[in-house]
Amino acid sequence: SNRHQDQVCLIGAKDSYHSTYSQVCEVAVPDARFNDKDQLTYQPVPFATLLDGLRDSFSAALDCEPVAEDYALSNQGQELYGMMTWRLPESEHSGLALALRSSYNSSIAPAFGVGEAVFVCANGSFSVDGMIKSARQTTNVMETLRELTRDVSSTAISDFRAMAEETAGWRDVAVKDDLFYAYCGLLFGRKVISSQLFSTAIKYWNACRDGSLHREHATENLWSAYQAVTAAMQRSGPRDSFRGYGGLHHVTRAVFNSGGCVEGSSQIPSLDVEAAMRVATN
């Protein structure tokens, strides 16, 4: 599996460091704060409570334990960033990843998001191709988090399973170099990826093809094309990839609908992104 998908990034995050679960749990939990009327204004969620709650809830809903957990602490241990990944029977090639962040210094409310491609960085960057939920650390924050977790674990898992089913078919669609360049061009033109990501995706595709990078992404098919773009998106650590991942799906679906390259030919088939978008919104 791609190790960078299961790791928390430290790019541009000074004084941050990778941490074990026990190191995260050792950080002292600050006291709750009250105003002069004795009303609760800040109720910290212990990092251990957040992690255990998310892990238990998702593991129960998925009926399996996570295969990887990665954490980073920043700002003298006051900010937490992490990722948990589960492998599901529906998809041997991709995991369901949960990215999370929280803090003890009021800088970040506890938030988590799930999807097939997620990115979390200790500099605050956070992007998910699924949904993100956040809870302010005030009254009832624990109950709010419990409700959010229940809601997300059930919805996200059914979304992921549908997605895994769809992407499985992408391996049967041939994508030659020229179609991949056209695919990236559409993504760039539609503002799904930047010019820098365009260039990174092409480099990733070429590196996989010449054997210097992931062998399993070297096959000339739509799955490898999609992986090249998500790898580029993850490496850049975009702050807001919601629009990005949504747009990526529409364009990928358009390539799938075209049938891809015909065997023995590198001709680019006609692509109808608008039709793929209409299907997605119906």
What does each of the following model-derived ranges do?
Residues 1-53, 57-63:
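Feature for intrinsically disordered/low-complexity regulatory segments and propeptides
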Residues 29, 43-45, 65, 88, ...:
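Intrinsic-disorder/low-complexity coil detector
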Residues 59-86:
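A short acidic/basic microdomain associated with nuclease active sites
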Residues 46, 78-80, 94:
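Residues at beta-strand starts and edge strands
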Residues 1-8, 13, 71-72, 87-282:
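Intrinsically disordered, low-complexity regions enriched in serine/threonine
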